Amino acid sequence: MGLFDFSVKELHDKLVKKEISPFDLVSESFNRIESVEDKVGSFITLNKEAAFGVAEELGDAGIDPNNMLSGLPIGIKDNIVTKNLRTTAASKILENFDPIYDATVVSKLKNAQTINIGKLNMDEFAMGSSTETSYFHKTHNPWDLSRVPGGSSGGSASAVAAGEVLFSLGSDTGGSIRQPAAFCGVVGMKPTYGRVSRFGLIAFASSLDQIGPITKNVEDNAYLLEAISGLDANDSTSINQPVERFSNSLTGDIKGLRIGVPKEYLGEGVDPGVKQAVLDALKTLEKLGATWDEVSLPHSEYGVASYYILASSEASSNLSRFDGVRYGYRSPNATTLEELYTKTRSEGFGDEVKRRIMLGTYALSSGYYDAYYKKAQQARTLIKQDFVNVFENYDVIIGPSSPTTAFKIDGMINDPITMYSNDILTVPINLAGVPAISVPCGFSDGLPVGLQIIGNYFEESLLYKVAHAFEQETTFHKEKPNL
């Protein structure tokens, strides 16, 4: 049994009792990376020397018994800036970017005394659902190396599933934590918009982006979200909501819980194996005293179209800062200022990023603004209202995290529309801004299936309670890939 088979709480107890040291945990991480990284490709940049340095310092100082995360190894998605540690967003344009400050979540993790093992691979600028658009390399799913780990936080999910780190941070703009968590058989939480500071997150779509934790089990996830949540003066969209002790909600008692199951989430296009795993999960929840009814989120069908207009429009604006002037890649082939802009961006951005910038610029252009951007915002309002309506009568909404299990590498990369449609069950949650968690709920043809539990605003504690109760009745989260 490896050290990462233990939970956060178990490892914390061992550290406090000095049965193990932070150095042991960091060694475990890098030994595992040495063993499997060539197969999975979870990381872009490793932080080996600094990680061992922090581990030695913590070992000498002793573990704070009141600090649950002290001395534990974490991986961080490479669109979250880390001072003096290369942060690339998996793009050529930021290939050598060395940030001069830490993101707020990174500062919080340092205060919690976690140890950063390295920066994790992702789709370029978080634009993708497979981690295939990374400038550096493709990441492979630990359950089947011929398949994708999901995206855009594919490295964050694969590193946890492969046992390279104990837990990780990802970001979720349209499903980028929940879908890879589902594909890799781990737990991923997209918090309520504003629950976690975005300061230091390289922006894709500012009204949709949210940082969240990826872990092996629900309890670990709750501890990590506790550490990174809270109001931040550097992020005007962060919300002044008390930081809850999410871990206190894991009581196992869900008697009387009212579940809404959207008919749109189990209809055409959902793989039979995925649908069956979700229905089996609902039976498990019924045994625990919950009840469920079929409900409707009637405007879900407009989710993908609205999302790709709005997210691309915001990306068009956010990515205009990458111009070769202040930081990042600068084309050596430019002779005029105009050439500097055009060549830097055409050489520095990958195909998918350029596709979305062009789509967003088109949607924002004067002749098409009303027809596309404004219409998408109106659809977003209707999608949000759908959730409000259901939550008047139900405590949580449940469905699959993805309509399929992990697909083959190169299977969809040349078919953007099919790839985009894979987000159909996750983007409405970002458009509405509500929280959702993906937990392992079974397998289909040997590949993990994720159960998506969606809550009302700031009801992460309830999501953790439901997810934990389900997890305690099953063993799916204990299954490990054979690497």
UniProtKB/Swiss-Prot annotation:
Keyword match ATP-binding: yes
GO MF annotations, alphabetized: ATP binding; glutaminyl-tRNA synthase (glutamine-hydrolyzing) activity
GO BP term (any one): translation
Keywords, alphabetical: ATP-binding, Ligase, Nucleotide-binding, Protein biosynthesis
Entry superkingdom: Bacteria
The enzyme's E.C. designation: 6.3.5.7
GO CC field: glutamyl-tRNA(Gln) amidotransferase complex
Active site per database record: K77, S152, S176
Catalysed reactions listed for this entry: L-glutamyl-tRNA(Gln) + L-glutamine + ATP + H2O = L-glutaminyl-tRNA(Gln) + L-glutamate + ADP + phosphate + H(+)
Protein's UniProt keywords contain Ion transport: no
Similarity-based family: Belongs to the amidase family. GatA subfamily.
Task performed by this protein: Allows the formation of correctly charged Gln-tRNA(Gln) through the transamidation of misacylated Glu-tRNA(Gln) in organisms which lack glutaminyl-tRNA synthetase. The reaction takes place in the presence of glutamine and ATP through an activated gamma-phospho-Glu-tRNA(Gln).
Quaternary data: Heterotrimer of A, B and C subunits.
Protein's name in the database: Glutamyl-tRNA(Gln) amidotransferase subunit A
Gene that this polypeptide is encoded by: gatA
